[in-house]
Amino acid sequence: MLSRDLSLVAENRLFSTLDTFMRKVRLPSGREILLSDTVGFIRDLPPGLVAAFRTTLEEIETSSFLVIVLDASAPDLYEIKGVVEKTLSEIGAGKIPRLLALNKADLLDADPLEMICSRLLDSGEAAVSTSAVLGTGIPELLDLLDAFLQKTETASGEGDVER
């Protein structure tokens, strides 16, 4: 979505995105960041796969920040978000600053999407609605990332955000 790399697989199919990809992304300020797209969060994995996924997810611990991409059209959006938060806490990444990208916004009418965004903002979450298919919300997400990094650097007193 952010790297605009058309070779990346995006399918609504179980285990379609098992590989981790890293891409450089230029933000509106000119700053370049490295984004890592990891495996998604899957509930009720067979026990044999849990260890393999955990190893991949534990790499998240070294991240300066997280962009959590959620399917805005999913009927169980808040349950999925809860699973993500629980998993992040379990692997020691619960305190890493994060932004939410509510993808597939093109599949929702404006009112339900606004309700979701308002609910998340009211709970203190930084969120932006996006559509990878239409490209909508991507400039706003990049602006939010830029502002977020500036705020994080100012708060930490550092020029670079590192873990």
Predicted segments with their positions:
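Short, contiguous acidic/charged loop-to-helix segments that flank catalytic cores in large enzymes
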Residues: 44-47, 71-76, 129-133
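Conserved G1/Walker A P-loop phosphate-binding module
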Residues: 1-50, 57, 61, 65
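Active-site glycine-centered loops adjacent to acidic/histidine catalytic or metal-binding residues
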Residues: 37, 103, 131
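Extended hydrophobic-aromatic, low-complexity segments
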Residues: 11-12, 27, 32-36, 43-47, ...
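Canonical P-loop GTPase G-domain recognition
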Residues: 106-160
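Conserved C-terminal guanine-recognition region of P-loop GTPase G domains, centered on the G4
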Residues: 30-31, 53-126
